[in-house]
Amino acid sequence: MGCPNCGSTTFESDTASGNTYCTQCGVVVEQDAIVSEVTFGEASTGAAVVQGSLVSNDQTHARTFGGPYRNQGSVESRELTIANGRRRISALAIALKLNERHIEAAVRYFTLAINNNFIKGRRSQYVVASCLYIVCRISKTSHMLIDFSDILQINVFKLGSTFLKLCRVLRPNLPLLDPSLYISRFASLLEFGPETHRVANDAIRLVARMNRDWMQIGRRPAGICGACLLIAARMNNFRRSVREVVHVVKVADITIQKRLDEFKLTESGDLSIADFRNIWLEGQSDPPSFTKNQKFQQYGAQKVSNIDHTQEYMSPIKRTPDFDGNEVKSEELSQTVKVESQETPVHLKADEREIRKEVTETLKGDELRKISLQVNVKFSEEEVTLEDVDDDEIEDILLDKDEILTKTQVWMELNKDYLAEEEAKNLKLQEDLKKGIVRQPRKRRRYRPRDSTSDGIADTAAESAKEMMQQRAFSKKINYEALDMLFDEEQS
């Protein structure tokens, strides 16, 4: 660098003022130079003190000490928010047994959320859990969103909503969920003992087969894992009920049953255990939604064809032929009916009245009522059988005896408090009846809106006031006749 005035390259610097000037012409080349080196000074007590301040990468200004005391530095609210977020993330990561690298990555996502003003109006634990779950998804760990809600004791649906909104703001490149990541975790919770690894391998093979048959896309990974673990347990002679699997994978039992029904319709579902372990089918089945849609289309086409077939044999008769085979014209028919109606004798009308009277008396009698009761009792005593139903949806709804017993036990367990209260009420009512205490049910009065068509509407204000006083009966000392005279005087 040369002097801008004379071009000389000889300079001298004054460290006290921070200026640099040319020795030939005296022009100041630099002034107020900032020195980045660390300097030390001496305090009044003789201790060495570092001069200057440190500005980190996430700060907007240096911390200043506002007095002779050491711990009076000002801290920004943003720094305080990041520090609190780091503390919450560390506590949650320790509970989930995550590493330090997961904590640092989650803190970076939390800082990005602060920069985008995402934390305003939201609880910090939802944002912290969402940031840490993003890191778990990217790192492909076996943690699920419901694990975070169990630890933090928060609603999993609200947490999922916050996670989706954070993904829309930050747009992280999240991989698709692979159900095989959760197989080992769920298998260890089902306690297969030394056969855990073997069961997990069979379940992972089942997951790959379901993915090949288009059963994994668009489905919750927990439901796929539950169905695969249930099949793998049966393949290795372990008796695990659907309720035990539901308790581990935390999905509904009907979800696992649907996955099992869908797998049963594939080609792999027809293989034996040895063939499934040794043979890998190269083909793939149609997606379950496609197969279901085909069934609906076939059912609709069959229904339309049945309607068309019925209409062919039941075409409407436009004209009425006579006995000789000749068609009767509509004009002649109307004239004939008109003449017959005019020539109807009087005694036929009287007979018709007598017939109507007899029918009415028969309908009002007790014999018809007894016959109807006998028919109703007969139909109520008959057992309803639905074995001949060929509808797939109704067959899925119907339960067998074991399922009915299980569902009854579940219902009794859930409603045992209500049943106990009802039993206590019945016992108390029986004791009151034995003691002669009879409590009649209180009838509610039905208040109907009154209009001009209602009965008992007062014509004048005096009558209305009189009716109100008689109905309410505020006092027996009121002279109702004086009320009539009072209103008469006002009207006059």
Curated annotation (Swiss-Prot):
TFIIIB comprises the TATA-binding protein (TBP), the B-related factor (BRF) and a third subunit (Potential). Interacts with maf1. It holds the Pfam family TFIIB. The lineage of its organism: Eukaryota, Fungi, Dikarya, Ascomycota, Taphrinomycotina. GO terms for biological process: DNA-templated transcription initiation; RNA polymerase III preinitiation complex assembly; transcription by RNA polymerase III; transcription initiation at RNA polymerase III promoter. Gene3D superfamilies: 2.20.25.10, Cyclin-like, Single helix bin. GO terms for molecular function: RNA polymerase III general transcription initiation factor activity; RNA polymerase III type 3 promoter sequence-specific DNA binding; TBP-class protein binding; zinc ion binding. PANTHER family: TRANSCRIPTION FACTOR IIIB 90 KDA SUBUNIT, TRANSCRIPTION INITIATION FACTOR IIB-RELATED. This is Transcription factor IIIB 60 kDa subunit. General activator of RNA polymerase III transcription. Keywords: Activator, Metal-binding, Nucleus, Transcription, Transcription regulation, Zinc, Zinc-finger. Belongs to the TFIIB family. Its main location: nucleus. It is found in: Nucleus. Zn(2+) binds at C3, C6, C22, C25. A zinc finger (TFIIB-type) spans 1-30. Residues 440-468 are annotated as: Disordered. InterPro entries: BRF1_TBP-bd_dom, Cyclin-like_dom, Cyclin-like_sf, TFIIB, TFIIB_cyclin, Znf_TFIIB. Disulfide bonds: none annotated. One of its GO terms (cellular component) is nucleus. It comes from Schizosaccharomyces pombe (strain 972 / ATCC 24843) (Fission yeast). PROSITE patterns: ZF_TFIIB.
